[in-house]
């Protein structure tokens, strides 16, 4: 990654944050990929640029629902030209917010950890669901299933809505739930018109200096969401998706124990993953 003259204040699984001043920071999406909470050694070329374009598209598309972390500044306003040229497609200037300490997950379809919970208990995060649902079943309505935020390298844990209220307070929990579902519904309706089913997604929210709930980080990318193609979707099977599921599936069959270090990912698996990300961008924004 490019060295920047700004001070790096945080390095996450995929994004690095740099300090601009006490109100703003620069968020740079790298080509790193994490799977099963382990950062893989092999970067995915152009992934950071594609994620940034998809996220920026959704921030603008959903701006009528709630405020977001954009400041209106460009990278050229905060970096020397030669640095800005290198990161312009993968970096955004954003507000410094106080992050809300939960992952706001909305599910419209049943799969993944939600399906496992449902098969055991008939519920997800304490929410009772109808009987007879199977892999990839559409849920009667989108559900808010929060999880606790883990440190880098730890696993997020699904929590009930009551636990969510305890963590962030009942008033904020109600606001987060309402906004998360509204964002999902608007995005899912739009994506469907482009041939994409948004199975589930994770939103990140923060509070600005006035306490206003603000959408932040990344929005509805293949890293934070499961996208399925309308053409290959059918109930009862796990549909192929436009995201890192392709690499996750390869890792599942590689015999890896899911502890660092991760195995080396073959070039063709990396290439197919890049193509999946690019296809999602093309479909959504065409």
UniProtKB/Swiss-Prot annotation:
Origin species: Pasteurella multocida (strain Pm70)
* BP GO annotations: 'de novo' IMP biosynthetic process
What NCBIfam families does this protein's entry cite?
PRK13961.1, purC
The primary gene name is purC
Q: Might you give the EC number(s) for this enzyme?
A: 6.3.2.6
Its protein name is Phosphoribosylaminoimidazole-succinocarboxamide synthase
Keyword check for Signal, yes or no: no
For this record, the Gene Ontology CC terms, alphabetical, are: cytoplasm
In terms of InterPro entries, this protein maps to: SAICAR_synt/ADE2_N, SAICAR_synth, SAICAR_synthetase_CS
Involved pathway(s)? Purine metabolism; IMP biosynthesis via de novo pathway; 5-amino-1-(5-phospho-D-ribosyl)imidazole-4-carboxamide from 5-amino-1-(5-phospho-D-ribosyl)imidazole-4-carboxylate: step 1/2
SUPFAM superfamilies, alphabetized: SAICAR synthase-like
Keyword Isomerase set for record = no
Q: List the residue ranges forming a coiled coil, or say none.
A: none
Q: Which family does it belong to?
A: Belongs to the SAICAR synthetase family.
So what does this thing catalyse? Answer: 5-amino-1-(5-phospho-D-ribosyl)imidazole-4-carboxylate + L-aspartate + ATP = (2S)-2-[5-amino-1-(5-phospho-beta-D-ribosyl)imidazole-4-carboxamido]succinate + ADP + phosphate + 2 H(+)
Q: Which UniProt keywords apply?
A: ATP-binding, Ligase, Nucleotide-binding, Purine biosynthesis
Single GO term (MF) = phosphoribosylaminoimidazolesuccinocarboxamide synthase activity
């Amino acid at each position: 990654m490019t060295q920047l003259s700004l001070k790096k204040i945080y390095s996450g699984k995929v994004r690095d944050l740099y300090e601009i001043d006490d109100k703003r920071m620069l968020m740079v999406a790298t080509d790193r990929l994490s799977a099963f909470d382990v950062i893989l050694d092999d970067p995915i070329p152009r992934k950071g640029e594609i994620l940034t374009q998809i996220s920026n598209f959704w921030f603008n598309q959903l701006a009528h629902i709630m405020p977001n972390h954009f400041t209106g500044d460009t990278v050229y306003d905060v970096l020397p030209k030669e640095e800005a040229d290198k990161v312009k497609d993968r970096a955004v200037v954003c507000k410094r917010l106080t992050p809300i300490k939960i992952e706001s997950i909305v599910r419209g379809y049943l799969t993944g950890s939600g399906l496992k919970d449902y098969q055991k208990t008939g519920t997800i995060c304490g929410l009772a669901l109808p009987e007879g649902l199977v892999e990839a079943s559409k849920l009667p309505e989108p559900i808010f299933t929060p999880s606790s935020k883990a440190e880098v390298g730890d696993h997020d844990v699904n929590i009930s809505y009551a636990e969510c209220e305890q963590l962030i307070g009942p008033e904020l929990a109600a606001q987060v739930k309402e906004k998360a579902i509204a964002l999902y519904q608007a995005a899912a309706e739009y994506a469907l018109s482009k041939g994409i089913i948004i199975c589930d997604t994770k939103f990140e929210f923060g509070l600005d200096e006035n306490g206003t709930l603000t959408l932040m980080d990344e929005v509805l990318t293949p890293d934070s969401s499961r996208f399925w193609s309308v053409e290959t979707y059918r109930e009862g099977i796990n549909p192929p998706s436009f995201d890192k599921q392709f690499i996750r599936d390869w890792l599942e069959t590689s015999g890896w124990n899911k502890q660092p270090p991760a195995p080396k990912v073959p070039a063709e698996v990396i290439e197919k993953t890049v193509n999946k990300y690019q296809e999602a961008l093309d479909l959504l924004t065409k």
